[in-house]
UniProtKB/Swiss-Prot annotation:
Residues 1-22 have a biased composition (Basic and acidic residues). Residues 391-404 have a biased composition (Polar residues). The keyword Metal-binding does not apply. Keywords: Intermediate filament. This is Lamin tail domain-containing protein 1. It comes from Macaca fascicularis. Residues 147-265 form the LTD domain. Belongs to the intermediate filament family.
Length: 404
């Protein structure tokens, strides 16, 4: 047996020498199996027949239904290693069919149309919500302009300043009374900025406004005609001032203001819009903030339309539940009641002066000690006054007995 083995080895060495002489470098291959699962379904492929039937080296299984198996050439190996690896591979493949995972169908690529747009700019629902919020803001701004208007005007009587032209061409007065005539003779139409008068126009005397009539004061730039008592041309004034800081006032001859007009600039309208939006934000407060300020367990009194899009579970957290308010009551100390007794019935060693405090604490131990000291300090000799009193008492008794 050993001779046969040596003979086979010699043959192999001779074959290697012949191949080296011919100069044809042998090319060997490594087979790598990487069973990477892409789909849930796998197909069986008997690779033993395909590999043993002379599969070309460097062949790559690129079938659309098969993936995970690659055969590549990496470097040069000896014939012994190649033969051993091939034989082992054939034995392992003949043992049973090889499971090759089927390639999963690729998902459609995002890059065209609406999907690509949404991938860049977000969900369409969010875009719709944002556009709705913008439309709501603009609509609210227009409502502010409609409600407030482009000016604020006030009056104390029936005469009002109806309009100050935006271009500063005229100022229009109106008599809002339906049946009264109003005299505006010698009245003053003036414009003030920061409390200082910048222009002043005095009406002609004996000017009367009929009921529901208008009077217009034109500036020189309007090139209007002077037609009293309805139209007056102010030649000295090129244009009226229309800035937001300018107030147009109609005064009586004595200087009392009876009507005034203030234009509203678009910036002021935006400021009002900002304040209203900020107020709406404050009205929808987080639960922790309301709990801190008002000591409520949950918060919000108003829910905007944006909040209504949330599920009902989130909205239920914003229900108002007012907690009980507890008032801290201080404990009252009851007044001390003094005993209804005469101070002369007390201990003779306690002061009986009416201004002396009777509730002053007294230590009994010290009082007892004082009594003992006083008893010790008393003299042992008898009291003469008491002896005389007893003698006189006995004598009186004897005299009464004798008289009987």
């Amino acid at each position: 047996m050993q001779n046969k083995v040596y003979e086979q080895e010699d043959k192999m060495e001779k074959q290697e020498q012949r191949e080296d002489k011919l100069g044809t470098p042998p090319v060997y291959s490594l087979v790598h199996f990487s069973p990477k699962m892409v789909g849930s379904v796998a197909t069986t492929l008997p690779l033993s027949s395909s590999l043993s039937s002379g599969m070309p080296l460097g062949y790559h299984l690129s079938s659309p239904q098969i993936s995970g198996v690659t055969i590549s050439t990496t470097g040069q190996l000896t014939s012994k290693a190649t033969a051993g690896s091939c034989s082992r591979m054939e034995n392992s493949l003949d043992a049973g069919p090889f499971l090759v995972p089927k390639k999963q169908d690729e998902s459609p690529m995002i890059g065209d149309g609406e999907d690509y747009f949404l991938s860049l700019f977000g969900d369409s629902k969010k875009l719709i919500a944002h556009s709705k919020h913008t439309q709501k803001t603009l609509k609210y701004f227009s409502m502010i302009l409609e409600e407030v208007g482009q000016f604020t005007a006030s009056s104390l009587g029936d005469i009002e300043i109806a309009e100050v032209n935006v271009k500063g061409l005229f100022v229009k007065l109106i008599n809002s009374s339906l049946d009264k005539e109003m005299a505006i003779g010698d009245h003053i139409l003036q414009q003030n900025v920061n409390g200082q008068t910048i222009s002043l126009y005095r009406f002609l005397p004996n000017i009367v406004m009929q009921a529901s009539s208008t009077v217009t004061v034109w500036a020189a730039a309007s090139e209007a005609k002077h037609q009293p008592p309805s139209d007056f041309l102010w030649k000295e004034q090129d244009k009226f001032r229309t800035s937001p800081d300018c107030i147009t006032i109609l005064c009586k001859p004595n200087g009392q203001a009876i009507a005034w007009y203030t234009p509203i600039h678009w910036k002021q309208a935006w400021e009002k819009l900002d304040t209203d939006i900020e107020f709406n934000r404050c009205s929808v407060v987080s639960p922790t903030f309301r709990k801190h300020v008002f000591q409520w367990t949950a918060s919000t009194t108003t829910i905007t339309k944006e909040k209504q899009d949330q599920p009902k579970e989130d909205i239920s957290n914003y229900q108002v539940e007012q907690a009980q308010v507890f008032l801290k009551r201080e404990k009252e100390i009851p007044p001390t009641v003094f005993p209804n007794r005469s101070p002369w019935c007390q201990n003779p060693y306690v002061s009986a002066h009416p201004y002396c405090p009777l509730i002053e604490p007294r230590n009994t131990s010290t009082a007892g000690g004082n009594l003992d000291r006083q008893s010790r300090s008393q003299p042992t000799r008898p009291n003469r006054a008491s002896e005389k009193f007893t003698k006189s008492l006995n004598a009186s008794k004897k005299m009464s007995y004798l008289w009987q």
